[in-house]
Amino acid sequence: MLIPRQPVPDLCVPTLAHGDFTISADAAQNFTLVVFYRGLHCPICLRYLLELSRLLPEFEQRGVKVVAVSSDTAERAQAMADKLRAPGLRVGHSLPLAVAREWGLYISASRGMTSIGVQEPALFSEPGVFLVRPDGTLYYGAVQTMPFARPHFDELRDALDFALAKNYPARGEYTAAS
């Protein structure tokens, strides 16, 4: 389990148009927003990433760098990017499932063809959203076991305004409870 205020696992994945993304070498002014999505087969992911790409300039104005990452192959990630039409959004791919596990993501097995006619990969990671401080520590994290009920990016943007204005600390750091 990832703990707020503690270092996150290293994350290094190729992106489609922005070179390799390595979280430890890509510190933002305030935060890096890492959005793990299921992949091309997920219509909810497409809508979610469209919302993210719409708000990308607002995150950037707040000193937040953004990357969307899946365990999809480069070809499948490119097909998703083609649907998104958001050239400013860094789209990472080929996330090793072992690294997904280190981030606390759930892994699902294929159920075959989806409702949109796209084959699910044999195994893939489920969604997660993380805010990482420039020092590589976790500020915020949310993981889902399925594509539903994810954090809304407009609410996250508004929460960032509060957190930055008030220098609000990461919460959930206490680990001594039994």
Name each region found by the language model:
Residues M1-S178:
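Chalcogenol-based redox active-site neighborhoods
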